[in-house]
Amino acid sequence: MKYTIEKITTLIGARRIGDTEAVVSWLLTDSRSLCFPEETLFFALRSGRNDGHNYIPELYRRGVRNFVVERGHFRLSDVTRVSDVTASTGTGGGLAGANILEVVSPLEALQRLAERHRDEFDVPIVGITGSNGKTMVKEWLYQLLSPYKIVTRSPKSYNSQIGVPLSVWLLGEQTEVGLFEAGISQPGEMQALRDIIQPSIGVLTSLGTAHQENFRSMDEKCQEKLSLFHDAKVVAYNSDDNVVSRCMRKSGYHGEKLSWSKEDPQAAMFIKKIERRNTVSTLYYIYKGKEGTYHWPSIDDASVECCIAAAVVAL
């Protein structure tokens, strides 16, 4: 989908410097990933080691004309009365013909724009979180669903405060299913990701010790991850995991709980047996009362667990 720069200015509540007409198809936070400069909107993000504002002159020289910046970085004269030399080189602060969108926080503006974009779609969206296995579950699900549906998914492991909005922006008019990862490292981070992804189906993978130093307990981390699914219609999880099962009970979640288990025959998917031969695993399962088998091209425990998570959602 394409947005005019005027509409984006309104959606993110920006103050616009410059009046060049433009259409935006691509969002950029890393100058090394530039592909289509004419239709790119660059968000100048700060990190502990870097400042995206420093790359604006270079991107201008490479053809980018639309930028989201922190307030106070540019003046009207930077995008209007500049010499021909400055305009052509992008040096000396000259950004002739550019659109500068000033906001308090470029990161929050990026997230808000992705959230507004997500609002345009009424299709099944699968949100995947957990300490381990998010990317593998997403990719297995993609392999299972893509022969039958047009699927939009997170690139690579794009599951951060920056990666999630960039992923959700990829939703297009042809999308029939979305698969998005969400990763957190400390309490309070999931709220923004939930607002962007707005999953209708949730998948909680295994929990581990990653980022545990930022949480008081494993239960606190589990509850933070489960908050992604506050409004989801269905949540799939491993009921054999005591922490996950306890958190699901405490979460107050009122949608459908789609559990899988190797121990509980009452689970939505009960794994009767797993056979491993050469490089293939065969799952013998009962799913909502119906028996079936599933063949998977891997035999290690972590891959098999991800396979089960993907299968319970795909079925």
Predicted features and spans:
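A generic structural signal for residues located within well-ordered alpha-helices
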Residues: 51, 224, 239, 302-309
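P-loop/Walker A phosphate-binding loop and immediately adjacent motor/lid segment at beta-alpha junctions
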Residues: 2, 251-260
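Adenine nucleotide phosphate-binding catalytic loops in nucleotide-utilizing enzymes
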Residues: 218-219, 256-315
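Phosphate-binding loop of NTP-binding sites
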Residues: 107-254, 315
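A generic structural signal for short, well-ordered alpha-helical segments in conserved domains
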Residues: 9, 56, 138-142, 311
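Conserved beta-strand scaffold positions in the cores of enzyme catalytic domains, especially
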Residues: 16, 81, 100-102, 125, ...
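Short, polar loop motifs at secondary-structure junctions
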Residues: 68-75, 239-243, 262-263
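N-terminal leader/targeting and accessory segments in enzymes
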Residues: 1-110, 272, 299-302
